Structures are given as C-alpha cells and as structure tokens.
C-alpha cells in the first residue's frame, strides 16, 4: 500500500535519539516517541549551527583585516589557532574555560602597523573582537 504513494510526497525524517540523551536517568521513564519528540525540540534549540556561522564570520573578518593591513599574517594565524584550540577544548569539556590570547595581542605591544605608513586609530576594536566571549562557547 505505501508503495502506491506518489514519489514526490516528502517523507518525514526519522529522529534518532543520541545515546548521551537516551542514557540520561531523567529520560529513562520516557517511551521512544516521547524521547524522539524531546530530541526534536533539542535540535531546534541547538546552538551549533549558529556557533559554526560565528566561527566562519570570524575567520573571514580576520582575513579581511589582514587584507586591509590592520593585522599581520602572523597575527591572523595566531588568532585562527586560538579559535581552533578554543573550539576543540570547548567540544571536549562540558564547561569551557577562558582562552588566554597570544602574547602578540597584549596592550603593552608598541609595534609598527602591518603596512608602512598606515596607522590604525585604535587596537581596542581588534581586542574587543578577539575577546574571550566570542571565542568560548556560550
């Protein structure tokens, strides 16, 4: 009978409950349908896609700032490494710790701008962009 249905009818994807959620003692008394419903709600509120978009936007921003000469290639690579390290650590632990920025970005640094003759008004905007709030998972 189900074979007689037209092929253009969309199918509802099966929602699989992850083992981590299924083994939770609070979910033990729920039946399979209730767990699937709860997990579908969990997927709606999942912040991972937003987190990935933020990371992508941050990497593009680093490249653009390097292109404009606000930061050097070494600084951009250092920031990308901090982001990668922070992401790996955040995914490995339940409560991520604060990330310490590389020495390159200390306020005491009095170096030359990336392009000769090009002065940046303030490095405070760069520091605010690199604050640990944007690097650690909220």
From Swiss-Prot:
Q: Which residues form a coiled coil?
A: none
- The organism sits in which domain of life? Eukaryota
Q: Name one Pfam family in it.
A: FAM216B
Residues of the signal peptide: none
InterPro entries found in the cross-reference section: FAM216
- To which protein family does this belong? Belongs to the FAM216 family.
Q: What is this protein called?
A: Protein FAM216B
The organism is Mus musculus (Mouse)
Name of the coding gene: Fam216b
